[in-house]
Amino acid sequence: RCARVCAVLFLFIQISYGQYQVPQVTVQALKPRGFKASIPDSPSVSLFVFQGNINRAISKSDIGTISGEILKAKDGRWTFEDPNVELKVGDVVNYYVVVVSNRGGYIKDNLSFTVSALEDPSSTGTGTDPVPTPTTCRPTATKLRSGVACAGQTIFEENFNTFREDVWQIEQYIPVYSTEFPFVSYQHLSQDPTVAVTGGNLRITPKLQQRMPGFTDSSIYSGSLNIFSGCTAPAEACMKDAWGASILPPVVSGRITSKAFAFTYGTVFVKAKLPQGDWIYPEILLEPFLKKYGSTHYSSGVIKIASARGNRELTSGYTDYSNKMLFGGPVMNLQCYDTLLESKASSNGRQWGDDFHEYVLRWAPERITLSVDGVEWARVEPTASGLSGRFPQTCSKLPRTFLAAGTKMAPFDDHFYLTLGVAAGSITEFPDGVQTSGSRPKPWTNTGSKAMLHFWEDMDSWFATWNQPQLLVDYVKVVAL
């Protein structure tokens, strides 16, 4: 049964027994609406997860209709709050909780709470000071990891006047576990950085690994890459030895994430100038915080807010894949990668990377829409059976059982965080059979075991086109629905 919980909730946690006792859970039903569940703080605790159903049984493998995770204690307690839950006297909340203590996960299940009265929101039930609730706060479908969002409220805003390390994490790792498998390593460089703020813009710039200090051309196929110090991923993604066709990632790039800020549902505004250059592409994404539907094959989903391949010319027959084509939308299956993706051609003949544009994602409980410069260009809605109903049965490894336990928008019904970056190559972003300028074919195949090697061997051709490889971001803003 433990394996089922790990698969649904967090594949990276090993459930443990006998070392930590989950304390009593304090549960409150609030008026006119709202729900709270909390446990007292302990120095060893690093995560509190709540899963519950109203008037319906729940097992350890279920994702509840009341669901959330808390990463930080406040006022001596780990408190999960959902201001949109409506309960009445006599309702029964069946639930379980998971607590991570000293890197071990501990489950307390078969719990229930019967609503005997609705409490005032200012009452904490724990003796701590009341938490003020704005009197003008209108309800919203938007949920935060902690705290309450109000309709129309700006819940995140970044203008990149400086780089704020308390808001953004600069990633450093080799994406060995990435489903896209880009041909890069993400590095936090102190000299000639890949991530910088200049002139009021975030600037993320890809570079060649062989031109980094201590590296040469031969390093790519016979050297070692050790970025363990400062690495933001497990150890296997922090070091690599080149061996045969398994070369070092030939491109060094930058990636930042807002892991301190994650949310469910809202409108995201990004004003950006996309990178240009053969075989590079931007990463302007929402990525799943907990990966509760699975961690492989996009099982927990990714939303591409905006992307355009960097090639100024890129075609396959009569189909244009160049920088003139904007694409984006949700991804939730590797085999059927582009099922929900949409595309839009530039209307004035210019490339998307020639100018700044405002890209907008509206993520709601009923649909996902994309806009650019105030014009909606994509809309993705679930079927009666959910978003998974948009996929034929031939799309294997879609976690249909888990998705059916969520809402119709599953897996896009949980907390996601912001990601900004630049990548190159990959096995998903450039279809096989395309040709770039001068009818030059794509140098690798997506299923080939030597894909990265063949990409690097064609470096003289593609690197000459990297005249504007930077992703420039003017601002990012998230507004509650």
UniProtKB/Swiss-Prot annotation:
Coiled coil (UniProt feature): none
Entry annotated with the keyword Plastid: no
Cell location: Secreted
Signal peptide: 1-18
Cellular component GO terms, alphabetical: extracellular region
InterPro entries (alphabetical): BGBP_N, BGBP_N_sf, ConA-like_dom_sf, GH16, GH16_GRP_C, Glycosyl_Hydrlase_16
Domain CBM39: 20-120
Pfam entry (one): Glyco_hydro_16
Keyword Glycoprotein: yes
Keywords: Glycoprotein, Immunity, Innate immunity, Secreted, Signal
BP GO annotations: carbohydrate metabolic process; defense response to bacterium; innate immune response; regulation of innate immune response
Sugar-modified residues: N110
Reported induction: By bacterial infection.
GH16 domain: residues covered: 124-481
A GO molecular function held by the record: hydrolase activity, hydrolyzing O-glycosyl compounds
Function comment: Involved in the recognition of invading microorganisms. Binds specifically to beta-1,3-glucan and activates the phenoloxidase cascade.
Similarity comment: Belongs to the insect beta-1,3-glucan binding protein family.
Record protein name field: Beta-1,3-glucan-binding protein
